[in-house]
């Protein structure tokens, strides 16, 4: 059972304290999870993929954690950049955001974005070039969708990391979002990573769902 799961079970203890192996594993997992929250997606990574990048009103990771409201809002300059780039408006806009896990972006983007884009196009949708949003919260997809004028926004965002898993991503889908969009209006596929829902499988599940 222990070999089939990464869950923290059967660590052993000596009296009231955990075993040295279990304790060191805990410290290592905690460091990895903390690191992915504060790590930045490199500019070189974005340039190699030719992705347009915009940013919310957040200026750094510390502000992102302490002011979640700023992660839901983009500057007018950023919104204007997006409006000009996506002309004419595509039916579907794919947004990639670091959120709370940079590892999720770096580990999964290349495995989910291409098949997701291709699947939607094969289903007959027009799909814009993927957009990268730095320091984004889920609500920011509403502002982007409204600015572009698309029918659907798919936001791929890094999830809050747990001990032992720092690469998990979620896909939030919303139809014709506005400032009045509610959280209950979104559909979500979560736990996207190699040991959860594989990125390619998540892409295959998402594309048909939008064609129905």
What spans do the regions from the language model cover?
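C-terminal functional extensions of proteins
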Residues: 159-212
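Short, acidic Gly/Pro/Ser/Thr-rich loop/turn segments
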Residues: 59-61, 101-102, 162, 180
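Fold-independent oxyanion-binding glycine-rich loops
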Residues: 54-57, 97-99, 133-136, 156-160, ...
């Amino acid at each position: 059972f222990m070999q089939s799961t990464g869950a923290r079970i059967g660590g052993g203890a000596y009296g009231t304290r955990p075993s040295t192996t279990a304790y060191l594993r805990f410290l290592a997992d905690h460091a990895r999870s903390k690191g992915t929250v504060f790590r930045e997606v490199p500019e070189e990574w974005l340039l190699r993929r030719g992705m347009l990048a915009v940013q919310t009103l957040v200026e750094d990771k510390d502000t992102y954690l302490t002011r979640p409201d700023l992660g839901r809002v983009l500057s007018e300059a950023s919104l204007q950049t997006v409006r000009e780039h996506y002309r004419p408006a595509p039916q579907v806009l794919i947004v990639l955001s670091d959120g709370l896990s940079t590892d999720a972006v770096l580990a999964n983007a290349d495995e989910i974005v291409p098949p997701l884009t291709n699947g939607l196009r094969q289903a007959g949708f027009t799909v814009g070039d993927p957009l990268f949003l730095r320091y984004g919260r889920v609500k920011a997809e509403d502002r982007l969708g409204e600015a572009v004028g698309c029918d659907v926004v798919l936001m791929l965002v890094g999830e809050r990391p747990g001990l032992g898993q720092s690469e998990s991503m979620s896909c939030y889908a919303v139809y014709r979002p506005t400032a009045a969009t509610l959280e209950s209006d979104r559909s979500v596929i979560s736990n996207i990573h190699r040991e959860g829902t594989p990125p390619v499988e998540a892409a295959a599940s998402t594309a048909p769902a939008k064609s129905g």
